[in-house]
């Protein structure tokens, strides 16, 4: 069954989509599925860029055999050694034992850790600035360490002006029959997933992404071929601008993300009152229950919005546990350039605002508003003035 797609006259997509996997990296929910992309270049010397996840092995090998036909496979270029892209290396080398595996020194260190058989592979070690010529195509290797593993390489092709970008510019989401971004309404179909993918998978490494973007800026890029999601051949500047914002922790919008935690509904009522007040002031606010929303979606909202409002009860003398997990994720990912407004609820000893302030103070270039909200057990009409003042401070931030 035909599972390959032509990108150019001699570059083919030979990947597969997975709609059965429930959690990417066994962490992040992906109800939209995911694609594992691999690319074949049919030149005087044939080349495959990366393999795929073990879950799609049958489809992948069928695709590879289809595009190769009776030809030999000359090179397997490994840009990224994460198992969702490298799991079939030993399978490919078993089918094509004369193939030369291309990577850098770290690539081969990791490869032998995953596959002891890799010690016997034919290898070509490359580094930043090296090239691989296959006939019409010449691939220039660009080091992109920690985007998002230390061994990551990018490859730029002189002939097609394509950037093989490893995990950079990728997204969650299976492909629905088309492989090109311009075959979709990308902002509707993929943008939220793309942002969530970036923020949670790559977000910690903004400085390293910036370094890679600076290298890419000197290239005439006409296509971007990532290891997840659709291929870009139009409007590439739009995607690069998104990555510029995301990697510099620059909000995409003035909108407000309000995240609350509530045991019995009383803190929820306070959060709803704050959201209502912000709407009355013309602000766009999105409200999220921290207990009912996977933290990866909340992290995506942090990357999107300028202002983050956090309201939750004190729990066992600490921060409400789901909110604490969210805070820990923000700190681990190095969130920057945001404004935080904090509220708390407690029946006898509310102290969440202080504890959240202490945690958030570890972040760079953030503003924590002095005006806070404290509810004792439940929201009452006597609290309206405090709610209004809290709303005003957020609206003016």
Model-derived segments and their meaning:
Residues 45-47, 75, 137, 161-164, ...:
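Structural motif
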Residues 44, 55-102:
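Active-site metal-binding motif and surrounding structural segment of the metallo-beta-lactamase
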Residues 5-9, 103-152, 208-211:
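Metallo-beta-lactamase
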Residues 4-64, 154-157, 161-165, 267:
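Conserved beta-strand hairpin/beta-sheet module of binuclear metal-dependent hydrolase folds
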Residues 49-51, 73-81, 101-104, 163-167, ...:
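Active-site neighborhood of phospho(di)ester-bond hydrolases with catalytic His/Asp-centered motifs
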Residues 88, 294-298:
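Short acidic active-site motifs
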Residues 148-152, 168-203, 247-251:
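Active-site-proximal loop/helix segment associated with metal-binding centers of metalloenzymes
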Residues 175, 186-224, 228-231, 273-288, ...:
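FMN-binding flavodoxin-like domain, especially the glycine-rich phosphate-binding loop
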């Amino acid at each position: 069954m035909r599972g390959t797609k032509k990108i150019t006259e001699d570059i083919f997509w030979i990947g597969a989509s997975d709609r059965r996997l429930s959690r990417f990296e066994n962490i992040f929910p992906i109800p939209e599925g995911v694609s594992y992309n691999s690319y074949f270049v049919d030149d005087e010397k044939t080349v495959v860029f990366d393999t795929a996840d073990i879950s799609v092995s049958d489809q992948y090998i069928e695709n590879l055999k289809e595009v190769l036909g009776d030809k030999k496979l000359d090179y397997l270029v490994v840009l990224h050694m994460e198992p969702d892209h490298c799991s079939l290396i030993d399978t490919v080398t078993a089918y094509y034992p004369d193939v030369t595996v291309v990577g850098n020194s770290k690539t081969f260190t990791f490869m032998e850790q995953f596959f002891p058989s890799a010690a016997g592979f034919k290898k070509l070690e490359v580094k930043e600035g090296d090239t691989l010529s296959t006939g019409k195509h010449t691939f220039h290797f660009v080091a992109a360490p920690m985007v998002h593993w230390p061994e990551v390489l990018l490859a730029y092709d002189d002939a097609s002006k394509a950037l093989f970008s490893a995990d950079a510019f990728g997204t969650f989401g299976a492909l629905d029959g088309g492989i090109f971004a311009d075959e979709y309404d990308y902002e509707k179909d993929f943008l939220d997933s793309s942002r969530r993918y970036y923020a949670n998978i790559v977000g910690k490494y903004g400085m390293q992404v910036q370094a890679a973007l600076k290298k890419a800026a000197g290239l005439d890029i006409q296509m971007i071929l990532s290891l997840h999601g659709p291929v870009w051949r139009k409007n590439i500047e739009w995607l690069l601008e998104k990555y510029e914002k995301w990697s510099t922790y620059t909000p995409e919008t003035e909108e407000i993300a309000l995240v609350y935690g509530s045991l019995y509904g009383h803190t929820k009522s306070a959060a709803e009152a704050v959201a209502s007040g912000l709407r009355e002031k013309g602000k766009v606010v999105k409200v999220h229950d921290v207990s009912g929303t996977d933290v990866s979606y909340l992290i995506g909202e942090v990357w999107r919005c300028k202002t983050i409002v956090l309201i939750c009860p004190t729990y066992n003398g600490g921060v409400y546990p789901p909110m604490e997990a969210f805070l820990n994720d923000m700190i681990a990912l190095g969130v920057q350039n945001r404004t935080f407004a904090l509220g708390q609820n407690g029946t006898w000893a509310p102290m969440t605002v202080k504890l959240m302030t202490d945690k958030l103070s570890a972040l760079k270039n953030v503003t924590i508003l002095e005006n806070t909200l404290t509810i004792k057990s439940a929201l009452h009409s006597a609290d309206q003035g405090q709610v209004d003042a809290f709303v005003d401070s957020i609206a003016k931030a």
